[in-house]
Curated annotation (Swiss-Prot):
UniProt-annotated location(s): Cell membrane
GO cellular component, one term: plasma membrane
Membrane-protein topology: Multi-pass membrane protein
Keyword Acetylation: no
Domain of life: Bacteria
Transmembrane segments: 10-30, 136-156
Keywords: Cell membrane, Membrane, Transmembrane, Transmembrane helix
NCBIfam families on file: MPN454_MG319
Protein name (record): Uncharacterized protein MG319 homolog
Organism expressing this protein natively: Mycoplasma pneumoniae (strain ATCC 29342 / M129 / Subtype 1) (Mycoplasmoides pneumoniae)
Signal peptide positions on this chain: none
Repeat recorded as keyword: no
């Protein structure tokens, strides 16, 4: 009985982990709950929050770290990112326009633009890099977030079930003590009879 209980708990945690991981991917990578199972590049996700326009707005206006744009602007930005990605694929010698360069905070980092012009990346990383950024990193992040979420939910559920079990045990003990008291009070009367 204990083995089946453990098996059921593990299966429940596995399903919960997958569900939370899927939700993580749907929010941050697919952009929809019913995706076509094509993961976006992490730079696309990065640019949703730290695009050149957003960084420029932060530096010029002096507002906080987050900048919220209207939905139409966000849609046009995502369309521009897709076009930029296609341009990069066609012309490998030019800089990747998805990376914020001119007028952004990143251009102030020493060697940032030079690195983009001629990135000195090992051959092994050049081969593995696309798989890392497109599949391994997002799936790994989703799995970790799924595990953390599943463990948190499991902890909350175990606390609730323990509280219910304790309440039932207390009620059972109270009922048993009432029954014992009744029989204890009735015993002398029976003897008299």
């Amino acid at each position: 009985m204990g083995f089946f209980k453990l098996l059921f708990k593990l299966a429940f945690l596995a399903v919960l982990t997958v569900a939370i991981a899927y939700l993580f991917l749907a929010i941050f990578y697919f952009g929809t709950v019913s995706p076509s199972f094509k993961l976006a590049q992490p730079m696309d996700v990065f640019n949703r929050f730290f695009s050149k326009e957003a960084l420029d707005t932060v530096t010029t206006s002096g507002v906080g770290a987050t900048v919220t744009a209207p939905k139409a602007a966000a849609a046009s930005q995502s369309h521009a990112l897709i076009l930029a990605a296609e341009q990069v694929a066609n012309n490998a010698n030019k800089l990747d326009p998805r990376f914020p360069i001119d007028g952004s905070l990143f251009s102030q980092i020493p060697g940032y633009v030079d690195f983009l012009k001629k990135p000195n990346i090992p051959a092994f990383l050049e081969k593995v890099g696309p798989y890392l950024t497109k599949y391994i990193i997002p799936l790994g992040m989703a799995l970790v977030s799924g595990l953390i979420g599943a463990l948190i939910i499991n902890f909350i559920l175990s606390k609730i079930t323990r509280a219910i079990i304790k309440k039932r045990r207390k009620a059972k003990r109270a009922q048993q003590s009432r029954v014992d008291d009744y029989y204890y009070d009735e015993a002398p009367r029976r003897r008299r009879r």
